């Protein structure tokens, strides 16, 4: 990405630093420092940044769900991750390029009640294990007969 100051100089247009350009919503879409470092960004209609690139070619892009929660990230090195959320905005799933993943469950107050990840760690009691009294439930290969919860 060529710094805007070079283009302005070539065109004979006077300017001063920092050079800052904003979109109609006030989001900063370009910024350049006096040392030539610069970056540009793009935003969605809700004001969430969806793309960012600096003057050295480093970039990342972001995606969001309808509630504004970040659901996907990817950068110029090939790294990526994705996230999922419940209706209350609690993160329920995370996965990245390396195959690492995490699953989360929450109670009605938003407190995390269960966590499981790709290395086999499990903490808490999954919602699927909470059944009626007298039922047999299997958790981590162990069977339990439930009493009243």
Task: Kindly label every feature range from the protein language model.
Residues 16-129:
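A detector of tandem-repeat and repeat-rich interaction/domain scaffolds
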Residues 4, 129-149:
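Short, low-complexity, charged amphipathic interaction modules
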Residues 1-21:
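Extreme N-terminal leader/activation tails
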């Amino acid at each position: 990405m060529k710094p805007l100051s070079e283009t302005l100089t070539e065109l004979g247009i006077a300017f001063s630093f920092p050079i800052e350009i904003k979109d109609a919503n006030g989001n900063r879409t370009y910024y350049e420092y006096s040392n030539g470092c610069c970056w540009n960004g793009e935003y969605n209609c809700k004001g969430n940044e969806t793309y960012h690139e600096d003057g050295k070619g480093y970039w990342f892009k972001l995606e969001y769900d309808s509630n504004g929660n970040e659901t996907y990230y990817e950068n110029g090195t090939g790294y990526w991750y994705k996230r999922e959320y419940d209706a209350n905005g609690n993160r329920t799933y995370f996965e990245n390029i390396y195959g690492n993943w995490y699953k989360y469950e929450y109670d009605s107050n938003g407190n995390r009640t269960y966590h499981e990840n790709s290395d086999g760690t499990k903490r808490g009691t999954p919602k699927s294990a909470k059944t009626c009294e007298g039922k047999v439930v299997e958790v981590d290969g162990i069977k339990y007969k439930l009493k009243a919860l």
